Design a protein with these regions (language model features):
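Conserved active-site alpha-helix within GNAT-family acetyltransferase domains
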Residues: 79-98, 205, 209, 233-251
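Acyl-donor-binding surface of acyltransferase catalytic domains
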Residues: 52-118, 254-258
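Residue-level recognition of the GNAT/N-acetyltransferase active site
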Residues: 49-53, 78, 199, 203, ...
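Conserved acetyl-CoA-binding loop-helix of GNAT-fold acetyltransferases
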Residues: 54-68, 198, 204-221, 239-244
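Conserved N-terminal entry element of GNAT/NAT acetyltransferase domains
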Residues: 1-19, 94, 103-125
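Conserved hydrophobic beta-strand within the GNAT/NAT acetyltransferase core sheet
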Residues: 74-77, 193, 227-231
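Conserved donor-binding loop and adjoining core beta-sheet/short helix segment
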Residues: 9-69, 74, 179-191
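Flexible, substrate/cofactor-facing loop regions flanked by secondary structure
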Residues: 8-9, 113-191
């Protein structure tokens, strides 16, 4: 957790202790007044978070963590949390990317897939072809934007696979192979569209739109009125796709990074 508000008054003098690898405590007379954590994501990137009520405690924790960890290091902040954003910038991190969170209405007009393409509903995709498509998409990302530009949940995992639950994926099939996919997760009552991807050689034919409107239609039939999705502001195609379906921006987060010295 990152602290968003700092209390006023006398700033405490604290001692920063590294408890275990990846965890720091700020101690004021043996009382914990702040915590810092470094988490390594599947692609190897290290993300920082600090929980502290006093600005000076935040600064001391962040400074100790940055001194102990190899760079680059990253953090993610709600863009409306100006104080927290300023705190990380004060520590030397700079904004690297911005993601918009969209609220997506499920009442959309279905988009028909192009001739020869069929939509395989979630839960019906064959495991082998789905994982093969996953490998193709990952290879194309490696050759293009790179995994650092992708959300954490689609990053390559230690086993070399990003498919955790095949039942969450609807796919587009053409000529006996899977050429596109969409994944929906539901951690809360509002479903999250976590990934929409189409093979590079099959893009710009309306496959992504067909997959997405199919998925939204299924949610609508289940009585769900909205879903949400996060889109990198630099991804012009994804932004255009979601906004063409009536999605509206609800909030934004920024990823900050401090590069190696």
């Amino acid at each position: 957790m990152n602290t968003a508000r700092f209390t006023s008054g006398v700033e405490p003098a604290v001692e920063i202790i590294r408890i275990v690898p990846g965890l720091w405590h700020a101690l004021d007379d043996d009382r914990v007044t702040g915590r810092g954590e470094a988490t390594t994501r599947p692609d190897g990137r290290v993300f920082l978070s600090v929980d502290a009520w006093h600005r000076s405690v935040f600064d001391q924790l962040a400074g100790a963590m940055l001194a102990a960890l190899p760079e680059p290091v990253h953090t993610v902040v709600d863009e409306t949390d100006h104080e927290l954003l300023a705190s990380w910038q004060r520590a030397g991190l700079t904004i690297r990317r911005r993601e918009w969170e969209y609220v997506v209405p499920t009442a959309t007009r279905p988009a028909s897939p192009p001739r020869g393409v069929t939509i395989v509903p979630a839960g019906s995709a064959e495991d082998g072809p789905l994982r093969e498509l996953d490998r193709v998409v990952r290879a194309e990302v490696d050759a293009g934007l790179g995994w650092a530009a992708m959300p954490a949940e689609v990053l390559v995992r230690p086993a070399g696979d990003t498919i955790v639950d095949p039942a969450k994926y609807a796919v587009a099939a053409e000529d006996g192979a899977y050429v596109g996919l969409v994944r929906v997760t539901q951690v809360t009552r509002q479903p999250r569209i976590g990934l929409v991807a189409v093979r590079a050689d099959r893009q710009r034919r309306g496959i992504a739109s067909a997959l997405l409107t199919h998925t939204l239609g299924v949610l609508r039939q289940a009585g769900i009125e909205t879903a949400y999705a996060e889109v990198n502001e630099a991804n012009v195609a994804a932004t255009a796709l979601f906004e063409s379906l009536g999605a509206r921006r609800a909030s934004s987060t920024v990823e900050l990074v401090r590069h190696g010295r």
